[in-house]
């Protein structure tokens, strides 16, 4: 699906600190409806901090976060998620004492897409591995299955934007390929997404636009072909 000009997320001039450490430096970032963004950069340069600033998990010292045109700076993660933003954090955060079925069903939220809604049945069709584990507790799943469950649970909210922080970190290659396949399906469904991952080759196969951060600022913004055609830039900013 081609992105539109409607901005679902608009962050302007963010300055976010951890104590005395200045992490985001006057950073601006947008997500349009239908857009898939690859958010990249070396470790510790502000990618997760940007996502947490958008989600209300960290409060910027200055700057503005608008979600679907509403001022949401400093609002709670719950309030942000109610506006259609789903967040899959690094570390997943599933409910280990609940079954796979319970993890999914507790997140269910009616959508507005009709037959294209992410229902319980559609999520299980997308993640057939979870069908085999419905009655297993979250803590009994492998790392890859937990990641599938976390993404499936996020889709059950029928979001407008899905944010994936370290989408395939620590996963076996076979499972990682399955996650990338699912990311492609999410793009085709029309949901906007922001994908953080170290595998720039896979990210750029899916993304419409790519943003590279360096020291809390945007160092590059452009299309996948532009990024892949510039090995010097990849080496400078990503070390590849």
Labelled PLM ranges:
Residues 55:
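Helix-to-loop junction immediately C-terminal to a conserved catalytic motif
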Residues 40-42:
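The feature captures the beta-strand-to-loop junction immediately N-terminal to the Walker
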Residues 137-141, 145:
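Conserved ABC ATPase signature
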Residues 63-72, 83, 116-120, 222:
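Conserved ABC transporter NBD signature motif
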Residues 162-166:
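Catalytic Walker B motif of ABC-type/P-loop ATPase nucleotide-binding domains
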Residues 154-155:
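ABC ATPase C-loop
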Residues 19, 75, 98-118, 126-131, ...:
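ABC-type ATPase nucleotide-binding domains, specifically the catalytic core motifs of the NBD
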């Amino acid at each position: 699906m081609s992105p539109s000009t409607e901005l679902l997320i608009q962050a302007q001039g963010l300055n976010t600190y951890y104590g005395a450490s200045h992490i985001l430096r006057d950073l601006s970032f947008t997500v349009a409806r239908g857009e898939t963004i690859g958010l990249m950069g070396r470790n510790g340069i502000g990618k997760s901090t940007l996502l947490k600033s958008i989600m209300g998990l960290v409060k910027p010292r200055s700057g503005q976060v608008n979600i679907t045109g509403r001022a949401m700076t400093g609002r709670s993660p719950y309030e942000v998620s109610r506006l259609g933003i789903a967040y899959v954090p690094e570390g997943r955060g599933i409910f280990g004492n609940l079954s796979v079925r319970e993890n999914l069903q507790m997140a269910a939220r009616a959508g507005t897409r009709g037959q294209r809604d992410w229902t319980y049945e559609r999520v299980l069709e997308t993640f057939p591995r979870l069908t085999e584990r419905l009655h297993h507790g979250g803590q009994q799943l492998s790392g890859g299955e937990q990641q599938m469950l976390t993404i499936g649970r996020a889709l059950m909210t029928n979001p407008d934007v899905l944010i994936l922080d370290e989408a395939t970190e620590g996963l076996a290659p076979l499972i990682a390929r399955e996650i990338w396949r699912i990311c492609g399906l999410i793009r085709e469904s029309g949901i906007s997404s922001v994908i953080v991952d170290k595998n720039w080759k896979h990210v750029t196969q899916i993304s419409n636009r790519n943003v590279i951060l360096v020291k809390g600022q945007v160092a590059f913004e452009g299309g996948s072909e532009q990024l892949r055609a510039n090995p010097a830039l990849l080496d400078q900013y990503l070390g590849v």
